[in-house]
Amino acid sequence: MLIELFNKGPHRCLMFCDMGAAQDAVQTNQFLIVNGETGAVLDPGGNLAYNDLYMGVSRQFPPHKLSAILASHADPDIIASLDRWMTATTAPVYISAIWERFVPHFCKPGKTAGRVVGIPDAGMRIPVGGSELIALPAHFMHAEGNFQFWDAESGILFSGDLAVSVGVDPSRIVSDLGPHLRHMEAFHRRYMVSNKILRLWADMVRRLPIRMIVPQHGCPLEGPAVPAFIDWAEGLDCGVDLMGPQNYRMPA
C-alpha cells in the first residue's frame, strides 16, 4: 500500500506499508524521498519486502536514479534486502559507522566495496537532489548505533523504532495520541534502553518544527499527537530502568 506523506513542488515523501506482508513477520514501513531528479530509499526492509517495494518505487521514480539508501540501524527488517539493492542501483548505503563492517554480511562478497558510508555518532547532512536529509543521533533507541532522519522540507521526522505502534492499520494517520498509546506502550518499555536516552532525544527534537513523526512500524503521528508523543516518551520508564535481579536468574 502506498501512502503519500508529502507532495509539494519537486519534493515528495512516500510510505510503503505491508510490502510482502506475512502473518509470521513483523509489519514494516519503507520510504521513498524524491527531490527533483534524484531520490533516496529509507529503511528498505528485508527480502520479504523487496519485490513489492522495488515495483512500487519503480512506479514512482526510476530506481537507477536513487542517490542514497538510508538505514536507521542494521536489523534484518531494516536492511536484509541490501544485496538486491546493491545490484539494482548504484547508490551508496548510509548507516551508523558502528555497523559499517557488519553490512557486508548481508551481501555477496565485494558488492558493498566503496559503497558503504559510515555515519559518525554526531550525525551528518545527506544531500538528496536540491534538498537534504539530516541524520539525527538516536543511539540506543533501540540500537547502539541508530539514526533518525529529519526532512526539513516536509517537516517529517522518520523515527525508526521510536513511535512504533503494533497491531494497527499503518495507513491510518494518528492525531489523537491517547487512544493510540495502548498500541505503543509495551513495545517502548521493552525496546527503548532507558528513560535517560528518551529525555535526551526529547530535548533535541523539541527544537524542530515537526509536522509528522513517521516510524518504521505502525502509524504515522501528526498534529497534536507529535508534541504529545514527545512528552509521553520523555516521562517513560523503560529498558534497564525496569530491570532487576529477578530478571537475571537461572531458569527453573
Predicted regions and their residues:
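Short, structured coil segments at secondary-structure junctions
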Residues: 9, 88-89, 112
